[in-house]
């Protein structure tokens, strides 16, 4: 494994608050924000009052989550531990002593939002800028998952080589 890749993998870059906030937190917040906007748009077109409230709640929730992720990344870049979690659900989980569980619930909700927007056809109601935001969030999120998987495999390969005393190519 090259030194730079080794440092990324062994140094845990893919587990740093900066990486996680920018590749998971912000994209998930963008999905929630666009979902809220789409809910508002649908509510106004179809005169569905409860959907208006739901849309506003989603927009506020998403906005807070995006701000929390950005602040977490800023603290990480400054070399400090963030006093807040990546999202509101993880923050609530911290108070209950289970931030990881609540962060996983947030991930499930975010993926459910993605599926709903795609399968309902709401994605067709995004304007040009909103669609680009959706594409950017999707790209960053998916590429980061692929990078983490690739580096995990490189680490496993390196460990196998070390165990077998095989020189790298």
Language-model segments: residues:
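Loop-to-transmembrane boundary segments
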Residues: 8-21, 91-118
